[in-house]
């Protein structure tokens, strides 16, 4: 039996049978249209207004709805790559010193105010709530006032909420002791800034995440001595405003963590990590990993406050366990004073210059 072959017309019909294809036969409208609409002056004017106000007619770069689309993510990331870069070039910023640290570590007056509020909250709830284990010690160590009058101020807080207040009091006591790190970050930024911004060329410019706590302290230190500093803020639900000590033209807001991290690392000459939480740990491990894998320039990575960091993570245990090499322990160092941290940075780069690396 002879094999049937399709005619070219049949192939065309098969390949173009999709809706709206050019090969679809035209449909005949059973209702005759009004052929005089183009002569309706009012209608034409209305259509012209619609053309001029249509999103499709606006310049693509000015179409916010377009830029916010998921498909435009790459364009948005490119903008976040380019905008800070142009600002850094305009201000002749050739290198930066990153300062990371916790948002909850604030200056002493703020920490004392927070502790006072925590004491007051515990005192108001103590009369009607059973004391959880350890609460008595926390209250008495945090407050010199007598607790005999607590009953007269008692609220109707539940045992759970009272326990939470006790926990907040304990945290406030601890955070008060960390005020020294705020002072140290501020002094460190003063030392670095005043040594490196004496002319139009700006080296070792302080750069932070732009928020409160240790970040504020570092920007504030540069501000103290009339020097510039950078703040890379991130747009998050209910998140921070920038601290008031950042140089205005060097304060940026990012949508993407990836682009923010890129600008942290790009010009980094040193990374100094003060005590902090998950965000600080994230930056620490990312920087260590980039150095471990030789994916960023050699920089000193300094952990400020050995006592804190040795409790947070046991690096020696990682080496002893074989999951990192002994050589990886040399990727970072510790510092206890601002002067020591700054000297380590100077020594690191002088040694690299001496070796020609």
Listing of model-derived features with the role each one plays in the protein:
Residues 114-117, 223-224, 286-291, 317-320, ...:
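Short, solvent-exposed amphipathic alpha-helical segments in soluble enzyme
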Residues 12, 303-357:
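C-terminal functional extensions of proteins
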Residues 30-34, 46, 51-232:
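Glycine-rich beta-alpha loop segments
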Residues 255-302, 352-353:
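Active-site/ligand-binding-proximal alpha/beta "capping" segment
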Residues 2-66:
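Non-catalytic accessory regions outside enzyme or core folds
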Residues 89-92, 197-200, 223, 243-246, ...:
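Solvent-exposed alpha-helices and their adjacent loops that cap or buttress functional pockets
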Residues 226-239, 274, 288-311, 327:
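Short, acidic/small-residue loops that bind anionic groups at enzyme active sites
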Residues 205-208, 212-274:
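Phosphate/pyrophosphate-binding betaalpha-module
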